[in-house]
Amino acid sequence: DLAMSVEGVGSAGGRDIGGQDGMDLGMAAVNWETMMLEYAGANNPLYVVRRSELQELKPNKFAICSFEPNTKNYDVQKFPLESSDTLFLATDGFVDQFGGPHGKKFMRRRFRELLVETASLPVMEHEAHLKHQFEAWRGEEEQVDDVLVVSVRVP
């Protein structure tokens, strides 16, 4: 259970860390023998790029440890993998970054296109490619949030 996996996140050493913030999270597990992916997410989707086509595994639209803990269950989705699929999990920092010629957000549509482009590269080039694209978009704008993109190529 996704909520149980992060039990205690909303406190620090038994003391409340305050606020009404939750945590966005995506968790994935792969059974390499059956090539089956299991995914559960709290506001963070998982993307699978297969032969230049992107599939998005949608998350539940509520955060971990938000407002009333232990009141919501997270859906676990199963997805059959194929060799050379590329999986991406990311925080929302990339899509929420302001930049470009008009100081607008990067947005999900552009991010999805970038993931398809990135998946066509050797996996060892993913980090440099994503970092370059992020910096080019950001330009002189301040970075607004943490940015993490994890990519995995299925052998």
What is the meaning of each model-derived region?
Residues D1-P155:
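Conserved subregion of the PPM/PP2C metallophosphatase catalytic domain
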